[in-house]
Amino acid sequence: MNYHRDEDYLKNESMFKNIFQKRFNLIKSHSRSGISTVLDVGCSNGVFLDLFSGSETWGVEPSKIADRAERKGHMVLNTFFEQAKLPENYFDLVIMNHVLEHMDNSAVVLTKAYKLLKPNAILFVDVPNIGGLGSRILGKHWPYLLPKEHKHQFTKGSLTKLLEENGFKVLHWESRSGIFEFANPIRELGRKRFLLDLFAIPYSLTATLLGMGDSMSFVAKKI
């Protein structure tokens, strides 16, 4: 998938729900004590937060689309994460879904996330995988490169090291591409882009099985 913007969320909300459902399931499998409070950094229109029914949902979103998330009942701060005034030692989960690569100082951002989380709480990070198969094959044409927008690129090793240096223990890591991003690929059958995803299955399957997909997820615990 290419890098997504606010208009992409609005036009393809059901597709993103399918993607986020898989990430939600992954988070839940590592949150044995439950999630009563969740913060989504870069929450857009709140489509990821929508999955956390019964939880107190917070978001940080600097763009105007924050209004849509707020209208859904999420508590949203319309500012940048670095400037956001948020309660410390409060959240069971902080989500950074394709956000960390945009930040000026990744270490500062992770330090702030650490302070916001309760002891032993969970940080979920999803970022492009520059160590993946797509990046190696396509080089400067890799769609996730976006040098004007992505200030950082990460490999499994580099982000694991960064998380550990900022007080986190990685509980789980995985990498995926194509239809393997979806919780239920069958739901995408009516979408035009899904035909391209089907043709790309040999690549997507190989990349996913090798742990060299275009995106990667980290579930980390505050220690």
Describe the residue ranges of each PLM region.
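S-adenosyl-L-methionine-dependent methyltransferase catalytic module, highlighting the catalytic core
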Residues: 96, 104-112, 122-223
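A short helix->loop->beta-strand "cap" motif at the edges of active sites that frequently abuts
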Residues: 55, 118-121
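Basic phosphate/pyrophosphate-binding loop/patch that engages nucleotide-derived ligands
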Residues: 115
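Conserved N-terminal segment of class I S-adenosyl-L-methionine
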Residues: 1-97, 106-111, 175-176, 184-189, ...
